[in-house]
Amino acid sequence: MLVFVTLGTWLAVIDIDLATIGFFAWIVLTYSLKFLWSPLVDNFSIPFFNKFGKRKSWIILMQILIIIFLFLISITDPSTNLSLFAKFAFFVAFFGSIQDIAIDAFRIEMSEIDEQGNLAASYQLGYRIAILLATSGALILASRTNWSFVYQLMSLFMLFGFVGLYLTPENKNASLRQLSFSDSIVAVSYTHLRAH
């Protein structure tokens, strides 16, 4: 939401034209296209982060990158450097989509099938709270402070994810099997084509 609704509001407040703001909506397409890079997340581990486990290593790296690029957004003036601002927003969305893949896989692999409903509900609750903070909370705060501060604060909120990740063990659901890289590309493509 920080690179969609909240970012669009920031741009509107500083009188960026609506066509340009509409163009920023394309940034969130990264979430729709995440099936393209999900086989990479499924089959490769992050060097230097392996000690945390495959899924956690992806989540940790993506959170670090999101924090960095949210901070870069916060120190970039979109009225004078819109193209750089857009690039930073794209990277936040792109790394966020990769983090989504890793979090979904982590959630699915950490428990047995009969516990999946509870985990999905907990995930949705956390997601909805994050949306409220990143939209309504950010807009209320921006009306009282400034956009730079809001995005810096939101990047700090990302640190809560590290706490949750640290407290959660990375278990392996024994009923799931790992697909090879080529099989996962075929499976993802087939599933995506069937759904659409």
Regions found by a protein language model. Name each.
Residues 121-135:
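Glycine-rich segments within core transmembrane alpha-helices of 12-TM secondary carriers
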Residues 151-166:
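Symmetry-related core transmembrane helices of the 12-TM Major Facilitator Superfamily/SLC fold
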